[in-house]
């Protein structure tokens, strides 16, 4: 597992890459200030861009990526993490999978996507 922490002007980004199982996930941890707006009203950071190559799916790779991302986010001070899910770009079993990982539906955003939050 390769983990990279990037320091941007308004946030820190965690990039987790599973080179063996061909997957990746990213976390954004906003720095204090005006950028930390209403998007982060329910959590300290956001997980996004979870992806595993199709031929490596359903083998635990995505779970390992998510767990690693959560651990790294916690190291940067996050106590909760959020992610978005929508039925246009993702199948219902993915929402159920997030819920099995401990994510709970918190709200629906202005784009119609569900906002899920987990305490870490």
Q: PLM features: residue spans?
A:
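Acetyl-CoA-dependent GNAT
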Residues: 1-48, 108-109
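Short coil/turn motifs at secondary-structure junctions
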Residues: 30-32, 55, 88
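Residue-level recognition of the GNAT/N-acetyltransferase active site
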Residues: 48, 53, 86
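Conserved acetyl-CoA-binding loop-helix of GNAT-fold acetyltransferases
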Residues: 52, 58-71, 96, 100
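Conserved GNAT acetyl-CoA-binding A-motif
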Residues: 73-87
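Active-site/acyl-donor-binding loops of N-acyltransferases
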Residues: 108-120
